[in-house]
Curated annotation (Swiss-Prot):
Residues that, per the record, bind S-adenosyl-L-methionine: G69, R74, D91, V92, T93, L119, Q120, Q135
InterPro entries: MeTrfase_NTM1, SAM-dependent_MTases_sf
Enzyme Commission number(s) of this protein: 2.1.1.244
Catalytic activity from the UniProt record: N-terminal L-alanyl-L-prolyl-L-lysyl-[protein] + 3 S-adenosyl-L-methionine = N-terminal N,N,N-trimethyl-L-alanyl-L-prolyl-L-lysyl-[protein] + 3 S-adenosyl-L-homocysteine + 3 H(+); N-terminal L-seryl-L-prolyl-L-lysyl-[protein] + 3 S-adenosyl-L-methionine = N-terminal N,N,N-trimethyl-L-seryl-L-prolyl-L-lysyl-[protein] + 3 S-adenosyl-L-homocysteine + 3 H(+); N-terminal L-prolyl-L-prolyl-L-lysyl-[protein] + 2 S-adenosyl-L-methionine = N-terminal N,N-dimethyl-L-prolyl-L-prolyl-L-lysyl-[protein] + 2 S-adenosyl-L-homocysteine + 2 H(+)
GO biological process terms, semicolon-separated: chromosome segregation; N-terminal peptidyl-glycine methylation; N-terminal peptidyl-proline dimethylation; N-terminal peptidyl-serine dimethylation; N-terminal peptidyl-serine trimethylation; spindle organization
Major location category of this protein: nucleus
Recorded GO CC terms: cytoplasm; nucleus
Name of the gene this protein is made from: ntmt1
Species for this entry: Danio rerio
Family: Belongs to the methyltransferase superfamily. NTM1 family.
Protein name (record): N-terminal Xaa-Pro-Lys N-methyltransferase 1
Intracellular or extracellular location(s): Nucleus
CDD domains the UniProt entry points to: AdoMet_MTases
Length: 223
């Protein structure tokens, strides 16, 4: 839907890369000045994710997770490393990944890969991941690239694996953001793109207790 709003895909991606290169490699930088919401976000994500993890029929394993648009590793440090044996990070900004190695501290030894790559070009290793976590980054992909990326993520899942998309949700339609060269989609648009990727939404909920002035944030569990 938003592809008609994007006149030049090349500049759409290059301008986003340029924006993030000027962002300080801090939690506050990763959250656009809203570093204070990090704990609320992580706690909500942990409750969401733990509904699916465990042993037995239909449960998602805890071997390896992928953090997409990982930045300095905020989600890896506080959500994924406490729950998974190993984690991979992928982000388009090398400076953030370099910072992640120190930000993660001693636990960085359980990070197996730091991939510097835009998600439109990233190819997850087949059947490697129990969980692929995609937060606050899908707005940097065009519709077609998001669908293609989700399809590649599906092939990167282990049996009973899970894709989680957690992101801002517009009230209606698609809203472009010229500051960071991204878009914000409403739920109907997002649901259609998920279906195009051949995935099903098995659970969805809205993040609670965020400031009123920011977009609603929804988490979707996909298989």
């Amino acid at each position: 839907m938003e592809d008609c709003l994007i006149e030049d895909q090349t500049s759409f991606y290059s301008e986003a890369e340029h924006y993030w290169k000027d962002v300080p490699p801090t939690v506050d930088g990763m959250l656009g000045g809203y570093g204070s919401i990090s704990s609320i976000d992580i706690n909500g994500s942990k409750k969401f994710l733990q509904k699916f993890l465990g042993e037995g029929q239909g449960k998602t394993g805890t071997g390896c997770a992928l953090d997409c648009g990982a930045g300095i590793g905020r989600i890896t440090k506080r959500l994924l490393l406490p729950l998974f044996r190993t984690v991979d990070l992928v982000d388009v900004t090398q400076e953030f990944l370099d910072k992640a190695r120190t930000y993660l501290g001693e636990e960085s030894k359980r990070v197996e890969n730091y991939f510097c790559c835009g998600l439109q070009d990233f190819q997850p290793q087949p059947e490697r991941y129990d969980v692929i976590w995609i937060q606050w980054v899908i707005g940097h992909l065009t519709d077609d690239h998001l669908v293609e990326f989700l399809r590649r993520c599906r092939s990167g899942l282990r049996p009973e694996g899970l894709i989680v998309v957690k992101d801002n949700v517009a009230y209606e339609g698609v809203i472009p953001d010229d500051v960071d060269s991204s878009v914000c989609r409403d739920l109907n648009v997002l649901h259609r793109l998920v279906a195009r990727a051949g995935l099903s939404i098995i659970y969805e909920e809205q993040q609670q207790n965020f400031p009123e002035e920011i977009y609603q944030v929804h988490a979707l569990a996909l298989r």
